[in-house]
A protein has these predicted regions:
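C-terminal, non-catalytic "cap/extension" segments appended to globular domains
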Residues: 10-11, 111, 115-118, 126, ...
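Active-site recognition of the HExxH zinc-binding catalytic motif
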Residues: 249, 377-397, 419, 424, ...
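A well-structured
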Residues: 1-310, 595-598
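Post-HExxH zinc-binding segment in Zn-dependent metallohydrolases
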Residues: 410-438, 447-449, 453, 527
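Conserved helix-loop functional segments at active or binding sites
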Residues: 326, 330-337, 363, 392, ...
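Short pre-active-site segment immediately N-terminal to the catalytic Zn-binding motif
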Residues: 312-317, 365-387
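Long, K/E/R/D-enriched contiguous segments that form extended
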Residues: 292-330, 336, 344, 371, ...
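Catalytic zinc-binding patch centered on the HExxH motif and its immediate surroundings
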Residues: 310-315, 348-368
Length: 599
């Protein structure tokens, strides 16, 4: 029997995050609630008074101060719940934090409509006044939203439903992380393996095809049993987005989602169109994988296993730490020292435990350390995940230490750039040190997986989302059957005829949590393409590349994301960044074919 995961209480504290930069303990967190409640109650005192620059500045300053405290409060509760999603006390904390946030959203809902209801000439003079200089960009973004902001009464009504409208995502998350269990699976030797959310991909990477097949079937059997529930939650998420877009006078839910970041829909469509033009390269990859694995048929449970037998090298966490440090050395001494600080100050929650939230992420607030959740298992993917999340955390640190609170939060469009640059630096650094053909093929395989998983796969997700929301907007039913068909057809399009499409594949859409953040996934693909350009510039020692990149990381949310990327040297007004990235994918395939000749 394979080793089972530990309970949270049995984990070594040195490998658990230290949340004390948020709150020292749960008691201190609880004691923060009365002050938050009192501050929220003061917000309506400004209602009817936001008609001059001085009062608006005072209101913005108060809201910024409150927002920092509220962020700490919510973040701590959320991270505590991630430690063990079965912990009823932590569940209650997050629920309370969400209630407080809902109360805040309701209390402040009058502000934007009130400011935007001012006469045009009065509003113009306020926007350009010296009093509001620290909030100039925020005011510009607010003006951009003017046609879509409702009356104060309507905004208050929507805000009151914040917690309710977030239910589909919470239900899906709870079902997957806390309630769903999977049948244990056997390998080719009859050994039994526990199967859960954290180790599924690890089992799919096994060289034992029997284990891969059994894990694949057991995993998606679990999703099939709940597929109608997942369809209902996803339908709720889509209907919420579509309804809000309609009442806010947007052309579509996608237009609403993209408007805040000032990204035109043509960027989204250009991504899909350009990736589809490079489909032959993905089909080439699938054929190469089939050939290298020596299979008559390539199935979906064969797409994660390493291309080279015996190449599943394992790393300790300490080795992973050093590998990440070596990889980011081109970014300079200050960057390296901050990564060391992250290790020393326990920003990272390292290992899986029973009930721990699946996946990986970086979190934190303006006043706290950044925090990283991961489930390290010793694979190259696990090492890469640390590099990835450290990229997020360093982006957050630089933004928070450069920008004011109101300008520190970078948008989702640029959020994945820093993380992917770190991943690429890691692989390139390892390739540079490796001449042995098998090891080199393992690294090239990892690189290819990055392109497959982040450019092709996320673009496929983007198509799925675009089509699912469009179906709802046309009045078509969002059901398990319709989502299964849509997803299965996209798998066929993106992977081609050389991949056997097993029935279980059609349920995969149900396990993608990012679908509950509408039109987020395409940003993984655009970010990856931007990161390819930036990492190549850094490694090629292009003049000013590191300086411009670190400036980009320090910009936070002080400019629109397309402008920030343009400052760093990436222009998404053309298809060039996507074409350039997929040309790199083709070159890596060439490298694999050449390396194979040396075996």
């Amino acid at each position: 029997m394979s080793e089972t995961m530990k309970e949270r209480k049995d984990m070594d504290p040195q490998y658990m995050w230290d949340l004390s930069t948020l709150f020292k303990n749960d008691e201190e967190w609880n004691n923060a609630l009365p002050e938050l409640d009192e501050m929220i109650k003061k917000l309506p005192e400004y209602q009817g008074k936001l008609n001059n620059a001085k009062t608006i500045r005072e209101f913005f300053d108060f809201d910024t101060h409150l927002g920092r405290k509220l962020s700490d409060f919510y973040c701590y509760a959320s991270l505590r719940n991630c430690e063990d999603t079965r912990d009823s006390d932590a569940q209650a904390m997050e629920a309370k934090a969400y209630q407080v946030y809902t109360a805040y959203a309701t209390a402040i809902s009058f502000a934007e409509p009130e400011i935007l209801s001012l006469d045009e000439d009065v509003l113009e003079s306020i926007v350009h006044s010296d009093d509001l200089l620290p909030y100039a960009f925020n005011m510009q973004k607010l003006l951009d939203q003017k046609p879509h902001v409702l009356s104060a009464k309507e905004e208050a009504l929507l805000a009151a439903f914040t917690e309710t409208l977030g239910a589909p995502s919470k239900i899906s998350e709870s079902l997957q992380d806390a309630d769903m269990t999977f049948e244990s699976v056997t390998d080719s030797n009859g050994e039994v393996h526990e199967l859960n959310q954290s180790n599924y991909i690890l089992l799919q990477m096994s060289e034992d095809r029997t284990l891969r097949l059994n894990a694949f079937k057991s995993f998606y059997k679990g999703f099939k049993q709940h597929i109608n529930t997942f369809a209902a939650t996803y339908n709720g998420c889509i209907k919420e987005a579509v309804a809000e877009a309609q009442v806010r006078h947007y052309d579509s839910s996608r237009a609403m989602s993209m408007a805040y970041e000032h990204v035109p829909g043509v960027v989204y469509d250009s991504l899909v169109d350009t990736v589809r033009k490079f489909m032959p390269e993905m089909y080439r990859y699938v054929r190469l994988r089939k050939q290298m694995l020596g299979l008559d048929e390539l199935h979906y449970y064969d797409v994660y296993t390493p291309l080279v037998a015996g190449s599943s090298k394992s790393y300790t966490y300490e080795e992973a730490q050093q590998m990440v440090l070596d990889a980011v050395t081109p970014l300079g001494e200050d960057y390296v020292n901050r990564v060391k600080q992250a290790y020393k100050d326990r920003w990272i929650d390292v290992y899986p435990n029973n009930g721990k939230r699946g996946g990986a992420f970086s979190s934190g607030t303006y006043d706290s350390n950044p925090y990283i959740l991961t489930s390290f298992t010793g694979t190259l993917d696990s090492v890469s995940t640390i590099a990835h999340e450290m990229g997020h955390s360093q982006h957050t640190w630089l933004s928070n230490h450069t920008q004011t609170p109101q300008n520190a939060d970078y948008t989702l469009f640029v959020a994945e750039v820093a993380s992917t640059v770190n991943e690429n630096l890691l692989v390139e650094q390892l390739l540079h040190k490796t001449t042995e053909p098998k090891e080199r093929l393992a690294l090239l395989n990892h690189y290819l997986e990055g392109f497959k998983g982040t450019v092709y796969r996320q673009t496929m997700f983007a198509e799925f989302e675009r089509d699912a929301h469009a179906m709802a907007e046309r009045g078509e039913a969002i059901t398990a059957a319709s989502m299964n068909i849509l997803y299965k057809n996209l798998i066929k399009d993106y992977f081609g005829e050389d991949l056997v499409i097993d029935d279980e594949v059609q349920y995969e859409w149900a396990r993608i949590p990012h679908f509950y953040r509408p039109f987020y996934v395409y940003k993984y693909a655009t970010s990856y393409c931007a990161a390819v350009a930036l990492s190549e510039a850094i490694l090629n020692n292009e003049e000013g590349a590191v300086k411009k990149y670190l400036e980009f990381l320090s910009m936070g949310g002080s400019a629109y994301p397309l402008d920030e990327l343009k400052h760093a040297g990436v222009d998404f007004s053309t298809p060039e960044p996507v074409s350039r990235a997929l040309t790199k994918f083709s070159q890596i395939l060439d490298d694999v074919e050449e390396t194979l000749k040396k075996l």
